Amino acid sequence: MIGKLKGLIDSYGEDYVILDVQGVGYQVHCSARTLQALPQAGGAAVLSIETYVREDQIKLFGFRSDLEREWFRLLQTVQGVGAKVALAVLSTLPPADLANAIALRDKAAVARTSGVGPKVAERIVTELKDKAPAFASVDPAVVALSGALDERSAPRPVTDAISALVNLGYGQPQAAAAIASASRSAGEGAETAQLIKLGLKELSK
């Protein structure tokens, strides 16, 4: 099995890259985010690899990090999610945002993925909510905020600040993570305007 490839970029396809490793060209399928982050033809690249062996083909999937590869594997444990859909999800949400979306049970963020309907998105955030933290870095403040939002016990300024950031065009996971951090910095009793200001500062980092 191939676990990692290191070589030079030969060329790109719609959803794959040809990686030249000592004269052998490997066709590696990647998420759109990974493809965008790779260098131009001739540049050096290292990809973590997931190898799929079928009766009629061998297919390689490449990732910028082991964490992205683990998400790829985990997503496919959900009913209705195959390799193509898993890559599409990772094209829409990087690992950190996906972890926060699941922690916040934000199915709308996952459903923005092409080919993922509301039912599949709900299965992803429901079935993976207890699995993702095993290897993903999820801010404890986000997890705590998730519980408060679920129980409708989050302070009004917090919910208003999240809504304000979402209205500014930020995704729910990013907005919630930023306000969770802002709330932790500002302490109890922080007003909406202060949380928004701190949240925007957090998002600009």
UniProtKB/Swiss-Prot annotation:
UniProt keyword Signal, yes or no: no
Alphabetical list of SUPFAM superfamilies matching this protein: DNA helicase RuvA subunit, C-terminal domain, Nucleic acid-binding proteins, RuvA domain 2-like
Presence of keyword DNA repair: yes
Annotated region described as Domain III, given as residue ranges: 153-205
One GO molecular-function entry: ATP binding
Transmembrane segments: none
Pfam families from the UniProt entry: HHH_5, RuvA_C, RuvA_N
GO biological process: DNA recombination; DNA repair
Alphabetical list of InterPro entries matching this protein: DNA_helicase_Holl-junc_RuvA_I (IPR013849), Hlx-hairpin-Hlx_DNA-bd_motif (IPR003583), NA-bd_OB-fold (IPR012340), RuvA (IPR000085), RuvA_2-like (IPR010994), RuvA_C (IPR011114), RuvA_C_sf (IPR036267)
Region (Domain I): 1-64
Cellular localisation: Cytoplasm
Flexible linker: region residues: 144-153
One Gene Ontology term, aspect cellular component: Holliday junction resolvase complex
Annotated segments matching region Domain II: 65-143
Entry keywords, A to Z: Cytoplasm, DNA damage, DNA recombination, DNA repair, DNA-binding
Subunit structure: Homotetramer. Forms an RuvA(8)-RuvB(12)-Holliday junction (HJ) complex. HJ DNA is sandwiched between 2 RuvA tetramers; dsDNA enters through RuvA and exits via RuvB. An RuvB hexamer assembles on each DNA strand where it exits the tetramer. Each RuvB hexamer is contacted by two RuvA subunits (via domain III) on 2 adjacent RuvB subunits; this complex drives branch migration. In the full resolvosome a probable DNA-RuvA(4)-RuvB(12)-RuvC(2) complex forms which resolves the HJ.
Family to which this protein belongs: Belongs to the RuvA family.
Role, per record: The RuvA-RuvB-RuvC complex processes Holliday junction (HJ) DNA during genetic recombination and DNA repair, while the RuvA-RuvB complex plays an important role in the rescue of blocked DNA replication forks via replication fork reversal (RFR). RuvA specifically binds to HJ cruciform DNA, conferring on it an open structure. The RuvB hexamer acts as an ATP-dependent pump, pulling dsDNA into and through the RuvAB complex. HJ branch migration allows RuvC to scan DNA until it finds its consensus sequence, where it cleaves and resolves the cruciform DNA.
Comment field on protein domains: Has three domains with a flexible linker between the domains II and III and assumes an 'L' shape. Domain III is highly mobile and contacts RuvB.
The protein, known as: Holliday junction branch migration complex subunit RuvA
Source species: Rhodopseudomonas palustris (strain BisB18)
UniProt gene name: ruvA
